Amino acid sequence: MTGRSSSATEAESALGEELSYLLTLSRPRFWLYLAGPVLVGVAYAAASVGELVTPATVALFAYFLVPANVFLYGINDIYDREIDAENPKKADREARYRGQRYVPAAVGLCAALPLLFAPLLSTAAWPWLVAFLILGAAYSAPPVRFKTTPILDSVSNGLYVTPGIAAYAAVAAIQPPLLAIAGGWLWAMGMHTFSAVPDIEPDREAGIRTTATVLGEGRTYAYCGACWLASAAAFGALDYRLGALMLVYPALVAAIAVANVAVDRAYWWFPAINTVVGALLTMGGLWRVAHG
């Protein structure tokens, strides 16, 4: 009995360690980067309070909160194993993949999960789920590996707004306005490229070319500012209040550049900033639902 009990305890401990690693791999600080757009999309697509919480919207939010992040960052860590060995960011707030066999299995499972809830969604949402999975894989995995191709690494990261587009389409059964898609895509391009600034030196040492390594820190800030200004313009064409809110991003990157703030510090501010901006966007959509 003692032997069996010990084996069971060891198995439970191992399972706990594996789940803990997968949670760390999924970047909890960034969970709302995928799940947040779902809330925004639902808030602006709903025609009534009853459309806000449905099996479809709950399934989308739950998937993009954790499993989608395991899928996205798991693929990234698997194919960046050698590069990450030299990246100091991995030793601090993230985890280094060391070849654990359960990680590819977990990534595959998370990629397949949308098959379970796709029947709950309008068919208008399906292409955006497929786009997320394809772009998420192609960004890190060969032979495409967008992350090593300047500009394409930035453009492909529009994948971060596909959850919101899918949510809008799932609720409204139509696609969101093209200006909203363009504004969101441009925001994601700027956000991705800004987040690559702390990796400039490790990527250069590893021989990886990205938009950030080609431009260098100063011009990368300018690129991000241009993306975010264009995003604000697109949203402003829909509603001036949306455009005004999105101006916070070019203002922030300009302040960081002028004040010479260390990007390693500024990088970790953005999850909180994005959460606040996303909450304001969502509240605006909910106000529309409640008050017309």
Question: For each predicted feature, which ranges?
Answer:
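Multi-pass alpha-helical membrane architecture of UbiA-family
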Residues: 1-292
